[in-house]
């Protein structure tokens, strides 16, 4: 099991293949992705790499983290993430991970945060059909209806689908195929859509349900 990388969503585009079919692509940029530390089975109970991305001002880093970066002899990073790995996939601290960490035709799993939609009603948030448009319904056409029973149990159960904050959820999309890798511009072109807004950070890992490397 290899480490993943922290990337940044650039946007979307599309291309046409030889059959004239349109393929939607999401562009992901991998820049300044560096190994910050190791987690070992003997010391921490599991094997992992700590990956950091984007240099940070030293004045914005806490004292404990300053020592971590000083020990690694690298510049402070804005975002850190651990990736579980197998024992034979450790990479030296301060090593830089580039886009060639992945290959064309490979399948990946991507974890990202969905775009926030703010406070949303039940029809938008949960796809409820709403109440009747006429015939006895007043004001509450887009209402979610009843939320519970009577004195027993006398409460609304947790997890009840109601109006509330929508979006900003951590989501993993599995088995997305890498269409192309541009080493000059540090871009990975991935077929399909990926959650999150432009410039948001996401995690790219080898697909857990597919072969590690599949050449197109």
Curated annotation (Swiss-Prot):
The modification N5-methylglutamine is found at residue 151. Disulfide bonds: none annotated. One of its GO terms (biological process) is translation. Methylated by PrmB. Residues 136-155 are annotated as: Disordered. GO terms for molecular function: rRNA binding; structural constituent of ribosome. GO terms for cellular component: ribonucleoprotein complex; ribosome. It comes from the Bacteria. InterPro entries: Ribosomal_uL3, Ribosomal_uL3_bac/org-type, Ribosomal_uL3_CS, Transl_B-barrel_sf. Keywords: Methylation, Ribonucleoprotein, Ribosomal protein, RNA-binding, rRNA-binding. Belongs to the universal ribosomal protein uL3 family. NCBIfam families: L3_bact. One of the primary rRNA binding proteins, it binds directly near the 3'-end of the 23S rRNA, where it nucleates assembly of the 50S subunit. Part of the 50S ribosomal subunit. Forms a cluster with proteins L14 and L19. This is Large ribosomal subunit protein uL3. It comes from Rickettsia prowazekii (strain Madrid E). The lineage of its organism: Bacteria, Pseudomonadati, Pseudomonadota, Alphaproteobacteria, Rickettsiales. The gene is rplC.
């Amino acid at each position: 099991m290899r480490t993943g990388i922290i990337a940044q969503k650039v946007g979307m585009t599309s291309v046409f293949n030889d059959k004239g079919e349109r393929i939607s692509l999401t562009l992901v940029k991998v820049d300044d992705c560096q190994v910050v530390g190791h987690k070992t089975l003997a010391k921490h109970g599991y094997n992992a790499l700590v990956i950091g991305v984007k240099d940070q001002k030293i004045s914005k880093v806490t004292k404990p983290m300053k020592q971590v970066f000083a020990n690694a002899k690298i510049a402070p990073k804005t975002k850190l993430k651990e990736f579980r790995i197998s024992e034979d996939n450790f990479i030296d601290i301060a090593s830089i991970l580039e886009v060639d960490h992945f290959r064309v035709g490979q399948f990946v799993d991507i974890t990202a945060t969905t775009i926030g939609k703010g406070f949303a009603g039940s029809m938008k948030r949960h796809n409820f059909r709403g109440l009747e448009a006429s015939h006895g319904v007043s004001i509450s056409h887009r209402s979610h209806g009843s939320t519970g029973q009577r004195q027993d149990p006398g409460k609304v159960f947790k997890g009840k689908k109601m109006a509330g904050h929508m979006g900003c959820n951590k989501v993993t999309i599995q088995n997305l195929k890498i269409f192309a890798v541009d080493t000059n511009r540090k871009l990975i072109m991935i077929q399909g859509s990926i959650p999150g807004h432009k410039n948001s950070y996401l995690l790219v890992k080898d697909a857990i349900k597919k072969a590690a490397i599949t050449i197109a």
